[in-house]
Amino acid sequence: MARGKNVELSEYERKRQENIAKTQALLRNLEMEAAEAGLGPTGKSRAAASSKPRVKKPAPKKIKQEDIAPRRTSSRLKGIEADSEKAKRKAEDEYVAIKEADRAKRQRVSDAFNFSDIVVAGKDWNRSGNFLSIGPANPYERTFDFDDVKETTDKELRALREKMSGLQLWEDFEPNEIKITPERIYAMGMHPTTEKPLVFAGDKLGNLGICDASQKVAEVKQEDDEDADNEGPTITTLKPHTRTIHTFQFSPHDSNALYSASYDSSVRKLDLAKGVAVEVYGPSDPNEDQPLSGLEISKDDANTLYFSTLDGRFGIYDMRTPSDQAELFQLSEKKIGGFSLHPQQPHLVATASLDRTLKIWDLRKISGKGDSRLPALVGEHESRLSVSHAAWNSAGQVATASYDDTIKIHDFSKSAEWATGTALTDADMKPSVVVPHNNQTGRWVTILRAQWQQFPQDGVQRFCIGNMNRFVDIYTAKGQQLAQLGGDGITAVPAVAKFHPTLDWVAAGTASGKLCLWM
């Protein structure tokens, strides 16, 4: 047949070629759609990895965690028929066993611990591990900056603002490198020593993280080595409690003694010199659930422990006696979020409660019988929403933070003159200063609390409080803002903030267990 001659196609051949054309068109459309969606093969292979070997960090020492939960077993292998009475009993027994295991995991342990027994992460505790040896928020939007400092006309106030605003984050490590606790931080504090910054933090699961902030970067980072791993500081993590550590305090009588209060219903004393943690208070019935929301040791008596509970009770306990000898007073029908003793007049107690009140109590006069036995109520002030904490300073002022988005400062500077049985009027209880402040922490951020510096060296009373825009605010007792501390590497709200007792060092913790430290 001549090559150029037209040939009439059969009906079958024509149909076959139409089907081929349709199939090819469909394939082309699919390829185009895949390319637009980014599913097709890339034109270039990934760049070859750098020939420079990457230094691997040594694997951290793993501590075996014992699982106390019962193991599931196969009913079929045991010959138990499905839906039989025997199978139902087996399922019920397994459910009870799992619930009991969960309860046992959360129940407090009353035994004394050596620190080496409760280290869960970081450096092992030994002689060298005693750190006391000398060796809606708008993230990052400032509400106080250096322009406010420059515009200050009062010379003394301006000097103080310049000083406090000049505090800098720990230069050796960024906050996102300093994971001081495994879980959300609830309590923060700095050891009273002035030799070096020694930071403690308590978290949601009962861990206590300890960071010696005098340590330096172990390895100098090479500028051209972008792949180098950033190692954080050495952290030691103890687990003295089985549930949230809500509050802790260094004893005013012994700086080696740290007292911690927990939702596991216990108070423990950690002896930092001996490396031992012992329970000093807990309900006499080990099954009683009495979560604690605060504790304090008076400067006048090293043996008396004051504490508050989430069910509105306030306790006084002589630690030399059995725990059932503790005096308990029902000061509120709702949760007491925090309390404090007047530093100079420790018979005066300020409580903040979910019932929206700040109340001042006088422990010198206790009257009534049974459940009605109470200290004398000096006065109370009601806010629009719940009050999270009440903190005395040594000048007789009380700072509170509440969900009505305010910080209130109440002036009771004449409290040293109050006779037993003094009753204040509503006008006397009104705050002298009200500072607008966003306190809407929500579910995932620890409640903001105003915390005074115990012994300011210049005599100017000041407190710090976390800021929802990822800063820490510092105010005077007159409500004047001194600084808004921030910096690079702060990726969450530093909600739990605390001053060093005497030095201008501020430590703050986040919901991810990270530490921010300004010095």
From Swiss-Prot:
GO terms for molecular function: DNA binding. Keywords: DNA damage, DNA-binding, Repeat, WD repeat. Residues 53-62 have a biased composition (Basic residues). SUPFAM superfamilies: WD40 repeat-like. InterPro entries: WD40/YVTN_repeat-like_dom_sf (IPR015943), WD40_repeat_CS (IPR019775), WD40_repeat_dom_sf (IPR036322), WD40_rpt (IPR001680), WD_repeat_DNA-damage-binding (IPR050853). The keyword Repeat applies. Residues 35-92 are annotated as: Disordered. One of its GO terms (biological process) is DNA damage response. Gene3D superfamilies: YVTN repeat-like/Quinoprotein amine dehydrogenase. WD repeats lie at residues 240-280, 287-327, 331-371, 380-420, 442-485, 488-519. The keyword Repeat applies. One of its GO terms (cellular component) is nuclear periphery. It comes from the Eukaryota. Residues 78-92 have a biased composition (Basic and acidic residues). DNA-binding protein that binds to both single- and double-stranded DNA. Binds preferentially to UV-damaged DNA. May be involved in DNA-metabolic processes. Belongs to the WD repeat DDB2/WDR76 family. This is DNA damage-binding protein CMR1.
